[in-house]
Amino acid sequence: MYNMRRLSLSPTFSMGFHLLVTVSLLFSHVDHVIAETEMEGEGNETGECTGSYYCKKGVILPIWEPQDPSFGDKIARATVYFVAMVYMFLGVSIIADRFMSSIEVITSQEKEITIKKPNGETTKTTVRIWNETVSNLTLMALGSSAPEILLSVIEVCGHNFTAGDLGPSTIVGSAAFNMFIIIALCVYVVPDGETRKIKHLRVFFVTAAWSIFAYTWLYIILSVISPGVVEVWEGLLTFFFFPICVVFAWVADRRLLFYKYVYKRYRAGKQRGMIIEHEGDRPSSKTEIEMDGKVVNSHVENFLDGALVLEVDERDQDDEEARREMARILKELKQKHPDKEIEQLIELANYQVLSQQQKSRAFYRIQATRLMTGAGNILKRHAADQARKAVSMHEVNTEVTENDPVSKIFFEQGTYQCLENCGTVALTIIRRGGDLTNTVFVDFRTEDGTANAGSDYEFTEGTVVFKPGDTQKEIRVGIIDDDIFEEDENFLVHLSNVKVSSEASEDGILEANHVSTLACLGSPSTATVTIFDDDHAGIFTFEEPVTHVSESIGIMEVKVLRTSGARGNVIVPYKTIEGTARGGGEDFEDTCGELEFQNDEIVKTISVKVIDDEEYEKNKTFFLEIGEPRLVEMSEKKALLLNELGGFTITGKYLFGQPVFRKVHAREHPILSTVITIADEYDDKQPLTSKEEEERRIAEMGRPILGEHTKLEVIIEESYEFKSTVDKLIKKTNLALVVGTNSWREQFIEAITVSAGEDDDDDECGEEKLPSCFDYVMHFLTVFWKVLFAFVPPTEYWNGWACFIVSILMIGLLTAFIGDLASHFGCTIGLKDSVTAVVFVALGTSVPDTFASKVAATQDQYADASIGNVTGSNAVNVFLGIGVAWSIAAIYHAANGEQFKVSPGTLAFSVTLFTIFAFINVGVLLYRRRPEIGGELGGPRTAKLLTSCLFVLLWLLYIFFSSLEAYCHIKGF
């Protein structure tokens, strides 16, 4: 009805939960009746064994008078307290969402380091400032356990520094819930046949050992060292175990104890930004790498310190690997959805990469909270927002270009080419933007380059007038032809002195100081005109020796230029040659053929098909080569009689292996052009006359030849657009950007917006899903908290620390209300604080973690995010929650000459029971790593069901025996 699939748990968990609530409520009333009958013989002892119906004043909430209401009023009061407590739990979950967002931003901070290789080459890369293990045990654990920790501290400080049952029992109860129920759920929800293993097993061993030690330590200080009294040194040592635990976990993560005595070498990996660690004997040669001025080698003390965290082991995902993965995803999406726009492909790729990316505990906690409160799937919302921003930015840029208020005047091209015999060359001037109703004037003037005015071209200057509505004008410059062999020459044409005329101006032309606001020169404002000589058959060459092409170009076109003349028809052969790039359709398609230049034709193109592999990085080469040019219709025994006077042109015939020329009409001294055939019996050995020598020299000067660049190296590179898209996506797939906020406006919009939750089909290509009924219900239930906590500073400020500080203060305030409500709820129905804490408060504070672990178990590749942090969080709860509270209270009482007394009974019994069950839990998890199951989570259905049932049973037994001890049915310590 309410789309409850989003909150569905295992049947085992649901059954256990309902059984627990029923048993607890019945238990409380039975215990109360039994305790009353026992009171007559047991005197004051029973005061600790029964739940009191008389409430005490809370830290914030007063007592609800009268103290002895009727049965109906008790039900009403209990309902009010329970509903208020649940509503406060919702508020804590939402502010904890902000809190975890700030932690994600803080722990995602990076720093740039410089790596200097042995050859002197330097590269830059980024590393995270926070070590993953350290952040998980400090900020992450604090974020997920803040309510329990603060409840313990506030309870002690708010009740005149006396020990209470609510805080410590909540911590122990929460630990039991995390250890048994959450892990049972994670084992069960993994799809049948799939497994999840803990990747960092060393860290798990250390945190599990510290977790069990933490609760063993509580028993020792309560029942062994100083029974019933917590001394100052015990409280402080409990607190200082926290940093010691963090250091031990960090040492295990960094492998610093045993590995310190193994020589380590570091080398730069083949991929940029990657540092690879080696272990073994010390080499004889010096192969050190410097990073930030430090020589990286094992004999350098304290290199791997906490300030500079180098990701050198196998757990780190290299930036280049991430980019290649993004490139692969984009390629697959293009093939799968060829009809989609690039913005849609970016959205799909962004969501897919974010879904597959390894995520922190904070992210899963945030995701779970937002799904529960109708805030939607954070990944899909982020991907859609990024795509919309990309489209809007494109529209804005287009609009700005089209609506530019200033008219730009510029040449259509920066370079123009023409033949010497063309007569005139035309240059186009463009007017773009601004008010087209104005009249714009612009001057132009030619300037000598290697070509000279008067002998090569006609000097030209003047003014171009753009009338209202005109956007394009043409100017012409005369070109002077001659019969002299010469190099290609060029001259310049400049635009200057833009003026604007409008009806508003009195004299018709605006003053110069106002022109720039209406019209100005654009780029290019200078054009270069190259004159190709037409008195020669031509020199054939590529434009440059090397060219770079994108693999996405499809068909690449390479120009072959004909310079220093363009007379006659010439054939130029060409072919491709393999280099590191392979032909045959692997990297390019083999191409060969001939280019035929017609008379006066100065450029031809060669087309080669390049294969698009859509690689993020590519650098392969092949070559394109042109052969010796030859004239069309060659004959070895033909020649042309040349006169001393007049012009000539190529006939396509050869004399003594050289081109034969003929006279050209309409020259200075025109004569008839006649082709003369030399007799076959002509003797090649006969001495040439001086006239024939001159003819031969001229023929030699005019034959087609190869130029400087006859072999072009083609370098195939990755697509710039494709690489740019990947780089942008890589930046957008930072989870800190996904969960963080940049402004209060963004937070308030998010607070009042209802979004669709998770989809079962996960149809990434479907239309955007509408919110369900459940999403609307949860949104309206939590909208007050969402709007209230939208006032918390965005994570953009102070790199997340402003949000961190304000959020933890808000959590503390709500936790104080929860403590009072839980205590009053318990006393109203006759439950002891210890039972209320273990059952209700621990459950309420652990619900977001439960769903976070469920999502992590199904989506993550490893089990670390779902259960790996449970053990560390349990240890941190004791060391911070109980350590801080008891240290403060012990110091306060010691300063007053008193002792800080803590009853060891219920707490010590619960701790001992939890420790025994925790050993069983860890043992079962380690056994599941055997090949027949394959991992801590998942596996065959039977194994999953048995494991989940066992863990749920352990939790029920823990609750059952703790309640029996609390009500004195069994003897504790």
UniProtKB/Swiss-Prot annotation:
GO molecular function: ankyrin binding; calcium ion binding; calcium:sodium antiporter activity; calmodulin binding; cytoskeletal protein binding; transmembrane transporter binding
The record's note on its domains: The cytoplasmic Calx-beta domains bind the regulatory Ca(2+). The first Calx-beta domain can bind up to four Ca(2+) ions. The second domain can bind another two Ca(2+) ions that are essential for calcium-regulated ion exchange.
Residue numbers carrying Phosphoserine: S285, S392
Free-text activity regulation comment from the record: Activated by micromolar levels of Ca(2+).
Family per similarity comment: Belongs to the Ca(2+):cation antiporter (CaCA) (TC 2.A.19) family. SLC8 subfamily.
Signal sequence extent: 1-35
Gene3D superfamilies referenced in this protein's UniProt entry, alphabetically: 2.60.40.2030, NCX, central ion-binding region
Organism the protein comes from: Homo sapiens
Protein name as annotated: Sodium/calcium exchanger 1
SUPFAM superfamilies cross-referenced by the UniProt entry: CalX-like (SSF141072)
Catalytic activity: Ca(2+)(in) + 3 Na(+)(out) = Ca(2+)(out) + 3 Na(+)(in)
Region (Putative calmodulin-binding region): 254-273
Glycosylated position list: N44, N160
Record key words, sorted: Antiport, Calcium, Calcium transport, Calmodulin-binding, Cell membrane, Glycoprotein, Ion transport, Membrane, Metal-binding, Phosphoprotein, Repeat, Signal, Sodium, Sodium transport, Transmembrane, Transmembrane helix, Transport
Domain Calx-beta: 396-496, 527-627
